[in-house]
Amino acid sequence: EGGAPFPPEARRGDAWTGFKRGWRDVSMQVAQGRAVTPFLQGKAVGGSTPINGAIIHRMPQRIHAAWADRHGLGETLPYDALDGIFDRLDDELSVEPTPEAAWGGNNSRFKQGADALGWTSNPTRRAVDGCERTARCNQGCAAALKQSMDQTYIPRVIQEGARLYSECRVERIIEASGRA
């Protein structure tokens, strides 16, 4: 991983400290093109997952189809094979629609407006196991309820024998005898 571990107990400080610890360039990166666009990138163990909103979307079929045409993804991983993978990830990461009790005023009003206009709306699906609504998702969940990679899969693979190197920059991966 490019950054250092950012354990939940270190996520209790102010926003500035959270941004310095969790975000590459203190969340001030931009991608330049026709427009300058903020480009947020995590730098802690777990990448961006410790400091994002834990929003989980399933890959739309139209995106898969485009990647299948452009990059040959369809031959390697057909779209219908993804359903079981998505279901397993949802189960392992506690992905479910955000409960109404956690919406807050803005989201509740948005839902009321959508209903009044006859629009269909759905709560965002998030990987959180019992959100406490601290509103610190982008600084890192101090309660360790967000199912980020540093809280879920990384400890699991370490327990199974993987080694984690933090604060390292990977320039290439050498594979030999089935190991990287």
Which role does the model predict for each range below?
Residues 1-67, 79-80:
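N-terminal glycine-rich phosphate/pyrophosphate-binding loop and immediately adjacent elements
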Residues 9-17, 125-128, 142-145:
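A broad, low-specificity signal for short, low-complexity segments enriched in glycine/proline
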Residues 21-24, 122, 146:
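Acidic, His- and aromatic-enriched active-site or binding-groove loops in soluble protein domains
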Residues 27-28, 52, 98-99, 141-142:
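A generic structural signal for short
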Residues 28, 119, 162:
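Short glycine/serine/threonine/alanine-rich loop segments
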Residues 37, 108, 151-152:
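Residue-level marker for well-ordered alpha-helical positions
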Residues 42-131:
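Rossmann-like flavin
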Residues 113-116, 127, 132-180:
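Helical element adjacent to the flavin cofactor pocket in flavoenzyme catalytic cores
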